[in-house]
């Protein structure tokens, strides 16, 4: 019943969206406009936002390591808050892994899930003291999940070897974030062959992003096959929302006027409307609105709502695969280029 209600609501919202789109002149957009929008107005600013928050992690963790007496607890709270800020910025950036995120295998390097406590313990014993030493530490023992484990599951004590290692993990995160900013500043693909590859990659990664949120993060944990993401920090719901909002921004046409070609982030719906593919745009808008309603306020303890959300996300995936990709002449294929 709830799923049917969500579908009806989504259809009504999509109808309103279609009427709005017809009332607003939508210019023609090329694949180059779409790809440039993803890189310049999505990837680049999101990488900068993540780097800014990751840059504050070493100082926050270092303060915890140096704290004494009554200052220790507030220092841990501050380190945890800074981790949450960095994590949410990362979720927005990593929601659509394209370009340098794939080339640098950033999802594996920065977000290997779940963290491996035994490997973290081994890394603490090794006591890496600089960037070169951290390169020899495997991804399962560092990155955001490992730091979450060190701040919540087994909170590092001031002055302890584990705290010194947590500081190295934080510094490693900040370094990789800076490297992503530099990589994201490169010119987006322009020649015909590169553009075709980048377009196909981005469409496929959008499908993968929706499926990752649906299965790995929501449905699989409900079946006991995995833990909900960010459970230790209690930030699961925030993580889901950060990912979904980033995905939605790349799919759904906003209420504001469509961007002049080449000047902003271009949602897929807007791109479709600009190319006259109105039926596909309407179906996509309806599916996204159903998912948006089902994900709003969703928490790990939401019971049947979790299944409804997973079903709604499956609907978005099906529209992307069966309607959007063919309309854009993009072939959907399986890729294990990134992630774990």
Feature locations, PLM:
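Sec/Tat signal peptide C-region and signal peptidase I cleavage site
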Residues: 17-21
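Mature extracytoplasmic or organellar-lumen-exposed domains after removal of signal/transit peptides
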Residues: 23-340
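Bacterial N-terminal signal peptides
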Residues: 4-15
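N-terminal leader/presequence-like segments
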Residues: 1-6, 22-26
């Amino acid at each position: 019943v709830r799923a049917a209600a969500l579908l009806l609501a989504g259809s009504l919202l999509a109808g309103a969206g279609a009427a709005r789109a017809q009332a607003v002149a939508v210019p023609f957009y090329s694949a180059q406009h779409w790809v440039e929008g993803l890189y310049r107005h999505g990837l680049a600013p999101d990488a900068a936002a993540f780097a800014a928050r990751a840059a504050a992690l070493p100082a926050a963790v270092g303060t915890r390591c140096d704290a004494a007496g009554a200052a220790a607890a507030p220092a841990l709270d501050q380190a945890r808050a800074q981790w949450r800020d960095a994590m949410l910025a990362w979720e927005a950036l990593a929601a659509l892994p394209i370009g340098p995120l794939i080339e640098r295998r950033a999802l594996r390097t920065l977000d290997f899930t779940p963290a491996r406590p035994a490997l973290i313990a081994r890394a603490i014993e090794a006591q890496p003291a600089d960037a070169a030493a951290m390169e020899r530490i495997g991804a399962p023992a560092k990155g955001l999940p490992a730091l979450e484990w060190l701040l919540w599951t087994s909170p590092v004590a001031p002055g302890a070897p584990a705290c010194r290692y947590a500081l190295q993990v934080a510094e490693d995160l900040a370094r990789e974030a800076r490297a992503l900013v530099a990589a994201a500043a490169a010119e987006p693909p322009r020649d015909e062959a590169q553009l075709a590859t980048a377009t196909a990659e981005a469409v496929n990664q959008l499908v993968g992003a929706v499926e990752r949120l649906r299965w790995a993060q929501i449905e699989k944990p409900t079946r006991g096959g995995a833990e909900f993401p960010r459970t230790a920090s209690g930030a699961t719901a925030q993580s889901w929302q950060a990912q979904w909002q980033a995905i939605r921004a790349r799919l759904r046409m906003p209420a504001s006027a469509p961007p002049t070609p080449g000047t902003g982030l271009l949602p897929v719906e807007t791109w479709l409307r600009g190319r006259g593919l109105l039926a596909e745009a309407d179906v996509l808008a309806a599916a996204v609105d159903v998912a948006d309603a089902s994900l709003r306020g969703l928490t790990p303890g939401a019971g049947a709502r979790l299944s409804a959300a997973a079903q709604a996300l499956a609907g978005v995936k099906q529209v992307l695969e069966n309607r959007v990709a063919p309309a854009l002449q993009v072939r959907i294929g399986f890729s294990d280029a990134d992630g774990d």
